Amino acid sequence: LKTLITNLNGHCLFNASRKTQTEGLIILHEGKYRKTDLEDFLKGGDIKIETEDPYEACRRIEEIIKGTKKHGRVFVAYNGRNLGPLLNFVANKVGVDGIFTCYNDKVVRLPLLKLDISGTKLKILNILYLKDLTARELGEEVKISRAMVYKHLKGLMELGLVKKSDSLEKYSITNAGKLSIS
């Protein structure tokens, strides 16, 4: 079963469903939603993402994508409104069979982006999610040398996932870092 998960509507939704030739359709929305004629022909439905918290929205979208992947191939089509950017981010993070966007009512396939974070960097992010720590404390928690901690922190800071905390001694996770591990 090929399924399209989307926040699109109108011509863009119709064009995306034709381009992906899906049998299933899941429309994600945040509130008011008008059913389309297309839904009568495809299996699926609409899912309301009921949260103001972007991290929780990402977790919910991830659950939906992973649950849908169990039944076959998954494609994502999004626009820049509301859930669209989060849907794109999670689709790239989790990995889907194709990502599409709509530009001037034309459907454009986008390349999949890979968020390449090593296991050690992921451990550091998960620890910093719980509390801010110094490089020495991180080394003790992760059980690596302080030099390696600084190397990993530098890479994470360049990606915008970690920053020096207000005390300038400790490191803390950024909002982007929280999204990357959500």
Where are these regions (language model features)?
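Long, low-complexity, Lys/Arg-enriched
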Residues: 1-73, 82-88, 92-182
